[in-house]
């Protein structure tokens, strides 16, 4: 098999969903720009990335397919990927689907959840989801409501008075219990809720659901809040000790320890794509900016998932301001190490990088260890191939830009 086939990668995209379950990263949905047109990625394709071997594979999906969308909210509970909301050619969605990721024959079948109790949220996209006690807990987002549905949890952006439909930002909380198949809204017991927003990000630490940043009207924010997921009380805006990250939207927030959150990228208040990374300690309420991240590879509307050895896997997104120049969608996978790797992982990486020099010794390894080594050899071969392809692509783009400007 040619390297181009063996080392294939999921297509470029932004506004997609990604989750990690076991040894695999799963990617679905999103959109890409082709000749100034927004094209949604196929709804019957799911891509898997083997964390050990570094190989991507595309699988065709069956069942009750969701529409091809961007801005959907994806979350994983007990090996099932749940997709809620999003935006497609027909408008905003409030439909909920799931697919079992733990299949023996790699057959992925979508199911639309229609037999439920309660009332789902109004249609919206760019919302967030906390997973807690087998529940999907949704917050915020941008979408539409009818006049009869207007509440204090909604900031109006635009309206169609003829159809009595309003568009805007939310700050309401909705829960879907996956065991009882029930939608409901919790009674918020106290605290000051965050103002309505979309394109924010969220993460769970213990029994607290954190949110950071996002956009409402023309304002991007850098405030941090949490909701106690047992008592349903808001923290109010958390007072930060020291420096804070810039105001932003379309960023990610990922838990990396019992008391730490990792913030990555986004679009700044002055519409600059960001490449920075920060770690927040929830015990000291301090942010610390990481200085070793690549400054030339900004990302916004990407995904960031935690791997099995606490590495952050950032996939897709855009390197341009989507609101002005919607062309720079990405499909490279950025991996950020947040703690020292195990001795076994370090040894496997060393062998994988130097497999030619160690070729005669590798075959002498015990079978189980040999399989791990062979996967790691494939991992580094794939990584080197993709880096070469990326550099060549950048050189071609830079050459084209130089020719265009001269």
Swiss-Prot record:
Tissue note: Widely expressed, with high levels in skeletal muscle, pancreas and liver. Undetectable in peripheral blood leukocytes.
Keywords of the record, alphabetical order, are: Cytoplasm, Kelch repeat, Repeat, Ubl conjugation pathway
Q: Which gene encodes it?
A: KLHDC1
Q: What does this protein do?
A: Substrate-recognition component of a Cul5-RING (CRL5) E3 ubiquitin-protein ligase complex of the DesCEND (destruction via C-end degrons) pathway, which recognizes a C-degron located at the extreme C terminus of target proteins, leading to their ubiquitination and degradation. The C-degron recognized by the DesCEND pathway is usually a motif of less than ten residues and can be present in full-length proteins, truncated proteins or proteolytically cleaved forms.
**Any one of the GO CC terms:** Cul5-RING ubiquitin ligase complex
Protein name (Swiss-Prot/TrEMBL): Kelch domain-containing protein 1
Cell membrane keyword on record: no
Please give the chief subcellular localization of this protein. Answer: cytoplasm
Biological process GO annotation list? protein ubiquitination; ubiquitin-dependent protein catabolic process via the C-end degron rule pathway
| Biological pathway | Protein modification; protein ubiquitination
Q: GO MF terms on file?
A: ubiquitin-like ligase-substrate adaptor activity
- Where is the protein situated, by its record's location annotation? Cytoplasm, Cytosol
Task: Report the InterPro entries cross-referenced here.
Answer: Kelch-typ_b-propeller
Q: How does it associate, per the subunit comment?
A: Component of a CRL5 E3 ubiquitin-protein ligase complex, also named ECS (Elongin BC-CUL2/5-SOCS-box protein) complex, composed of CUL5, Elongin BC (ELOB and ELOC), RBX1 and substrate-specific adapter KLHDC1.
The record, for Gene3D superfamilies, names: Kelch-type beta propeller
Q: Which organism is it from?
A: Homo sapiens (Human)
Repeat (Kelch) residue spans along the chain: 24-76, 80-134, 135-181, 208-258, 260-307, 311-361
Q: Which domain of life is it from?
A: Eukaryota
């Amino acid at each position: 098999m040619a390297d181009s086939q063996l080392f294939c990668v999921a297509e470029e995209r932004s506004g997609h969903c990604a989750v990690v379950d076991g040894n695999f990263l799963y990617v679905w949905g999103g959109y890409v720009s082709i000749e100034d047109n927004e094209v949604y990625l196929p709804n019957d394709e799911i891509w898997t990335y083997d964390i050990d071997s570094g190989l991507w594979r595309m699988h065709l999906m069956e069942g009750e397919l969701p529409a091809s969308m961007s801005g959907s909210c994806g979350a994983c509970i007990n090996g099932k990927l749940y997709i809620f909301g999003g935006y497609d050619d027909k408008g905003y969605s409030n439909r909920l689907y799931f697919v079992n990721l733990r299949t023996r024959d790699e057959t992925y079948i979508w199911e639309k959840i229609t037999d439920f109790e309660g009332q789902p949220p109004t249609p919206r996209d760019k919302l967030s989801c906390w997973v807690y006690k087998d529940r999907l807990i949704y917050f915020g987002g941008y979408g539409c409501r009818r006049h009869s549905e207007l509440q204090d949890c909604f900031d109006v952006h635009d309206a169609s008075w003829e159809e009595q439909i309003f568009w805007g930002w939310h700050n309401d909380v909705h829960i879907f219990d996956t065991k009882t198949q029930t939608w409901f809204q919790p009674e918020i017991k106290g605290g000051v809720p965050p103002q309505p927003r979309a394109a924010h990000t969220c993460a769970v630490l213990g029994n607290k659901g954190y949110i950071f940043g996002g956009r409402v009207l023309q304002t991007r924010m850098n405030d941090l809040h949490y909701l106690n997921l047992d008592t349903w009380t808001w923290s109010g805006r958390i007072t930060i000790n020291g420096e804070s990250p810039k105001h932003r939207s379309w960023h990610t927030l990922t838990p990396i320890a019992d008391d730490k959150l990792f913030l990555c990228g986004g679009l700044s208040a002055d519409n600059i794509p960001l490449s920075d990374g920060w770690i927040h300690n929830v015990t000291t309420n301090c942010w610390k900016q990481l200085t070793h991240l690549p400054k030339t590879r900004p990302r916004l509307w990407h995904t960031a998932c935690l791997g099995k050895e606490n590495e952050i896997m950032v996939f897709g997104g855009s390197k341009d301001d989507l609101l002005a120049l919607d062309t720079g969608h990405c499909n490279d996978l950025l991996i950020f190490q947040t703690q020292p790797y195990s001795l076994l992982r370090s040894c496997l990486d060393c062998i994988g990088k130097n497999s030619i020099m160690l070729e005669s010794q590798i075959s002498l390894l015990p079978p189980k260890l040999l399989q791990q080594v062979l996967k790691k050899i494939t991992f580094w071969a794939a990584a080197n191939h993709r880096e070469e392809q990326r550099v060549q692509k950048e050189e071609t783009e830079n050459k084209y830009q130089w020719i265009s400007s001269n």
